[in-house]
Structure formats: structure tokens, C-alpha cells
Regions:
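RNase H-like nuclease fold core
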Residues: 1-45, 49, 54-62, 134-135, ...
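RNase H catalytic domain
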Residues: 11-18, 52-136, 141-143
């Protein structure tokens, strides 16, 4: 299986508000950046969308090294919380509804197609690719500001 390294980030001005997402995919010395945004969204929806779009860009099952500064995304996947939420009808252990079940459902279907490895990185720090994703996500969010 090919190994693809993926860096993702999401941004939102206001929460909710205009938002953007970005992913950088690296494979065999090549790099591809994809990005987009929405007029009214949340930061967590943009973080999820970045990962979803990155995985949708893969044409075959891969080993995916995912780097994100979103503890929401990394913890829910790495610790299995998202699968638990789905099993309980999108209810969390605190009996509150899990947010963004539409995106989580899509993401869980995508991650099941790959061998996933999750890495949390501190945002706005020394990870150059994550910083580039952040900058692009912010630019995407600005396209929707009035």
C-alpha cells in the first residue's frame, strides 16, 4: 500500500461564521494542496471537512499519516469516540448529542478504507505544512466575508 502523509486545518471567522479548510497531501516526493470554504459554518465542521476532502482525493486504499491540530478530530478518531457516538445513535457519553453527525458518518466511512495513523500537532507552531494549511484555510474563509 502507498503511504500518503496528510496535513489538514480548518478556520472560521466567528463560530458560526465564514469558514475555510485546507489539506496538503504528500506522496513519493509530490505535494498537492486542496482547499475550500463555506459561507456559514463552524471551526469543527471545517476541521472535519479538511480530512474528508483529503481522503476523498485518494484513489485507492493507502496508509495515511494524518497530521491535524484539531484535538476534536484526532481524539475522536484515535480514541474511538466517534464510533461509540455512532453506535449510540450519535449520543456522547455525557448523554448530549454528538455534533456534526453528517460529517462524522462520512468520515468514518472514509477512514475505514485506509490504514490510518493519527498525529496531533500544536497549531501555529513549528509544523510548516500545518501552518501552510492554516494560512490557506484563513484565505478561503475570507472569500465568504461580507
Amino acid at each position: 500500500m502507498k503511504t500518503v502523509t496528510v496535513y489538514t486545518d480548518g478556520a472560521c471567522s466567528g463560530n458560526p461564521g465564514p469558514g475555510g479548510w485546507c489539506a496538503i497531501l504528500e506522496y513519493n516526493g509530490h505535494e498537492k494542496m486542496i482547499s475550500g470554504g463555506e459561507e456559514r459554518t463552524t471551526n469543527n465542521r471545517m476541521e472535519l471537512t479538511a480530512v474528508i476532502q483529503a481522503l476523498l482525493a485518494l484513489r485507492e486504499p493507502c496508509v495515511v499519516e494524518l497530521y491535524s491540530d484539531s484535538k476534536y478530530v484526532i481524539d475522536a478518531l484515535e480514541k474511538g469516540w466517534a464510533w461509540g457516538w455512532r453506535k449510540k445513535g450519535w449520543i456522547k457519553s455525557d448523554k448530549k448529542p454528538a455534533l456534526n453527525p453528517d460529517l462524522w458518518e462520512m468520515l468514518l466511512g472514509l477512514v475505514s478504507q485506509h490504514e490510518m495513523w493519527y498525529h496531533w500537532v500544536k497549531g501555529h507552531e513549528e509544523n510548516e505544512k500545518n501552518n501552510r494549511c492554516d494560512e490557506q484555510a484563513v484565505l478561503e474563509s475570507r472569500k465568504f466575508r461580507t
